[in-house]
């Protein structure tokens, strides 16, 4: 079939990396992952992080998650593509004392997965 004639998957394996997956129609799906920049939760600031490589045409999605389950608080964030090579994030960090949630002014770093082509 057609899949047998497609080029091999290429990319970089590592803490920050990417994979280019050949698709039909001479297109490539690109998946990227890594650790984004550190946000100061509660500051209201929007932070910009860079991808390992720029997407050639479309930066479709980015997903983030707090990367430290041992931390005293849990970070929550939102992210959006900004350019073909960057995305923006904003964060909030919460801690729990009994049944009370407290917002913290603290650093939050994220791991991300980005999808584009």
Summary of predicted features, one role per range:
Residues 1-17, 48-53:
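Fibrous stalk/shaft segments of extracellular and virion attachment machinery
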Residues 16-35:
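GGW-centered surface loops in extracellular recognition modules
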Residues 29-117:
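Extracellular attachment/recognition segments
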């Amino acid at each position: 079939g057609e899949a047998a004639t497609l080029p091999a998957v290429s990319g970089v394996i590592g803490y920050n990396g990417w994979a280019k997956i050949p698709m039909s129609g001479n297109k490539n799906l690109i998946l990227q992952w890594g650790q984004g920049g550190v946000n100061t939760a509660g500051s209201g600031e929007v932070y910009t992080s860079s991808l390992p490589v720029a997407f050639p045409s479309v930066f479709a999605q980015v997903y983030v998650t707090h990367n430290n389950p041992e931390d005293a608080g849990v970070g929550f964030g939102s992210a959006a593509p900004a350019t073909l090579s960057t995305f923006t994030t904003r964060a909030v960090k919460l801690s729990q004392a009994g049944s009370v949630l407290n917002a913290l002014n603290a650093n939050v770093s994220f791991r991300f997965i980005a999808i584009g082509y």
